[in-house]
Regions:
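Detector for C-terminal structural segments
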Residues: 378, 478-515, 583, 587-597, ...
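N-terminal lobe/hinge region of extracytoplasmic solute-binding protein
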Residues: 86-151
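Short, well-ordered beta-strand elements
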Residues: 83-92, 155-158, 177, 228-229, ...
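Append "and occasionally in soluble cytosolic enzymes with long acidic Gly/Pro-rich linkers
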Residues: 380, 467-596, 736-737
Length: 738
């Protein structure tokens, strides 16, 4: 069972959900971050959620996206399709098949085929193609029973179907639904594994259990082999997306922890009756700990190949990371010392097995497909003969699936040639045009939907010059955002003004009303100048003489070359904004072409630097007190739950923009605490939140685009595509025409 949140660490930068080997619960993911990433966004993580990150950089290429050698690559491509194998092309794979580490979007795709997360596994609830929650009739005998307790908490009772099986034929029982929560909420789990899953923190008794001050987890209870209940904390309620707090999925206890069992009441783990811990168990545990220590040391050495100079900013960061590494290694070494309690040893052994073995080789699952192998940039899956079907009663029939890494530049060519069967979520205008031409020629099928998110410029709002709202607003007035729609999205998109996706149900119901209340930031240097006059940066270099737009106009000759009439504050600090973007990103290029020139005209020095994704994430996730960069080109994708409190409240665990604003605290708290039955009240608060966001501008929305998915003509039944619904969701209704 999983109802978890996650924390950030040096080892993990992205927002992710927790493991539920046959479907996840997403309390960890209170929102975007849950961020869903796309192939044109960064899909290597450490969202760090989705997520992270919930945020990743939007990347792009030229309009044609063809490079030298691509034509030869098309000719040399090895086709692995056959009558029984569906091949899905992706741009990369990471190889993490459980949550808690990286959250590569294509690893997630594989997990969803296997039911490790998503709608195909036997979770207690699922999300349909329209983004609506339902209890899962594939899993449960009847609708869950919810009791509101006198202390404000809520207890949910579940009764499972008795015919559910793991891929190895073992029955799925209540023990499997409680095991994951007990394991990942254990006091040793995070220190031992480095996972960013922190367990079921929305349940009663979590804090005491996580701290190790009690042996029992009060918020869960086993009723019989096929029934159990959970109790949500009073301070978590009300919560508008209540199913997010109550959704539960199973983990294969018999495979991950074969020598453990649940106590009769299901509130703790114990050594299985009749089993004696062996010397081999102790040896295996010690070896697992040693392997973990070695990986921690290797990761540190990779991050810091050279020791920074004393007194440098890099040295401070290095010393902090070194201490964290040494502390973690010490804790791991200590775990091997002395006489270890048998139960403790087996719990720790299971934690390491889940995160070191099962993570890379999920041999037992309960979704429509089971894991065969991951090598040569391909994940190979085979039909799970023990799968009983999804909530609609549909059951997959295609014998094999291959998820194959390909060059995105030639993806559409491979699709036309039949070398791959599916290419999903394309957002580049040039490739979309190519796909449309192929569809019109009868070569492929094509579907499209509005992106559930947007590309943006994200700010640090508590340091540097971007800590002033007027500076952020001025930057918005220095952009021609329509150019991003035209040149990046190829016209397949629109400019947006708030924290929403065009496909969200809230926007569909209230979007027209909301837009009348929001500022539509358009290129307007006069407005930008007025706003900057309200900031401390209203002087010339001497800190006394008022800065003059007339002088700026006299000195500006059409570009920043030779221009040196910038704004300063009274202490002689220049108005400078430094932005970091990806070095292979067309978005970075578009921003570089606009902002430095436009900003100079109003006295702002705007610099755009590019580099690797990892460098961008480091600057964004771990900013210095005096940061090198306070602006970043990123992308946001919405998942479940939609909970801006996580990202913009001063108490939010994923408040990467460093917002500390009373109004933000109020509107985000009010939104999440809306009663689930008060839909109109929620929409009112959603509008109020977006009005705050549009004014405060922790991010500047640049564009929201359309996604296009292509598939070969032999693929049948792929007739539902939405932001919530992809091939890995529709697979149970799909066939291959022979």
């Amino acid at each position: 069972m999983k109802i978890n949140r996650v924390f950030s660490s040096v080892m993990a930068l992205a927002l992710t959900t927790t493991l539920a080997a046959c479907g996840n619960s997403n309390d960890t993911n209170k929102d975007d971050n849950a961020s869903n990433k796309t192939k044109e966004e960064t899909s290597t993580t450490d969202e760090k959620s989705s997520t992270d990150i919930n945020k990743d950089e939007d990347k792009g290429g030229s309009d044609t996206d063809k490079n030298e050698g691509d034509e030869e690559a098309i000719k040399d491509f090895e086709n692995v399709t056959d009558d029984d194998t569906l091949v899905i092309g992706v741009d990369n794979l990471g190889g993490d098949f459980i949550q808690g580490y990286t959250n590569n979007t294509n690893d997630v795709k594989a997990r969803r085929f296997m039911g490790i997360e998503g709608n195909n596994g036997f979770t207690t609830h699922y999300v349909d193609e329209a983004g609506q929650w339902h209890w899962n009739p594939a899993t449960l005998e009847k609708e869950p029973k919810i009791v509101n307790n006198e202390d404000g908490s809520a207890t949910v009772e579940y009764k499972l179907k008795k015919d559910l099986k793991w891929s190895d034929g073992e029955p799925i029982t209540a023990d499997d639904y409680l095991f994951g929560t007990l394991l990942e909420s254990d006091s040793n789990f995070n220190t031992l594994t480095g996972s960013i899953n922190i367990g079921a923190d929305s349940l009663v008794g979590y804090n005491e259990f996580k701290k190790g001050t009690t042996d029992e987890f009060d918020g869960i209870e086993k009723l019989d082999d096929y029934s159990f209940k959970i109790t949500i904390k009073a301070d978590e309620l009300p919560y508008f997306e209540l199913p997010q707090l109550t959704v539960v999925g199973p983990s294969p206890m018999h495979y991950i922890a074969p020598n453990l069992s649940l106590a009769d009441n299901g509130k703790s783990l114990k050594v299985k009756d009749g089993y004696k811990v062996t010397d081999e168990d102790k040896k295996d545990f010690a070896e697992s700990v040693d392997n973990k220590i070695e990986k921690i040391k290797e990761e540190f050495d990779e991050s810091y190949p050279e020791e920074p100079k004393e007194g440098s900013d890099e040295r401070k960061e290095y010393d902090e990371a070194l201490k964290e590494k040494d502390d973690q290694v010490k804790d791991l070494e200590d775990s091997k010392q002395g006489d270890i309690d048998p139960t403790r040893l087996l719990i720790d052994k299971a934690s390491l097995f889940e995160t070191e073995d099962y993570r890379l080789n999920p041999a037992v699952v309960c979704g429509p497909y089971k894991f065969d192998e991951y090598k040569n940039n391909m994940v190979k899956l085979s039909l799970n003969e023990n799968y009983t079907g999804n909530f609609n009663g549909d059951k997959a029939t295609i014998p094999h699936i291959i998820i194959q890494v390909i060059n995105p530049n030639i993806a559409v060519d491979l699709l036309e040639n039949g070398d791959i069967d599916i290419w999903e979520d394309e957002m580049k205008g040039g490739r979309i045009d190519q796909m449309k031409a192929a569809e019109q020629a009868g070569k492929i099928g094509l579907g499209q939907f509005e992106r559930n998110g947007f590309g943006n410029i994200t700010f640090l709002t508590d340091r540097g010059s971007t800590k002033y709202k007027e500076v952020r607003q001025a930057i918005a007035y220095l952009l021609d955002r329509n150019e991003f729609v035209t040149n990046y999205a190829g016209g397949y998109g629109v400019v947006t003004n708030g924290y929403y996706g065009l496909s969200q149900w809230m926007y569909k119901e209230r979007g027209a009303d909301l837009e009348t209340k929001l500022t539509n930031y358009t290129l307007n240097t006069d407005k930008a100048n007025e706003l900057l006059d309200k900031t401390p940066y209203k002087y010339e270099k001497d800190g006394k003489t008022p800065w003059s737009i007339d002088k700026a106009n006299e000195q500006f000759k059409g570009d920043v070359e030779g221009f040196d009439y910038y704004r300063y504050d009274e202490n002689g600090n220049k108005l400078v904004v430094n932005q970091f973007g990806g070095d292979d990103s067309e978005i970075t290029t578009l921003i570089s072409n606009q902002l430095p020139v436009n900003a100079a005209q109003v006295g702002m020095e705007y610099n755009v630097q590019s580099g690797s994704l990892q460098t961008l994430l480091d600057y964004y996730n771990f900013p210095k007190d005096d940061p090198d960069y306070t602006a970043f080109n990123m992308g946001t994708g919405f998942a479940h739950p939609f909970d801006p409190w996580l990202h913009f409240s001063s108490e939010g665990p994923f408040n990467k923009t460093k917002v500390n604003d009373k109004k933000a605290d109020e509107v985000t708290e009010a939104l999440r605490r809306t009663d689930p039955d008060d839909k109109d009240g929620y929409l009112d608060k959603w509008e109020e939140f977006n009005e705050w966001y549009n004014d405060y501008l922790p991010e500047i929305p640049l564009y929201a685009n359309q996604y296009h998915t292509g598939y070969t003509n032999r693929v049948k039944g792929f007739d539902i595509m939405t932001p919530e619904w992809h091939a890995n969701d529709q697979i149970n209704a799909m066939t291959l025409e022979k």
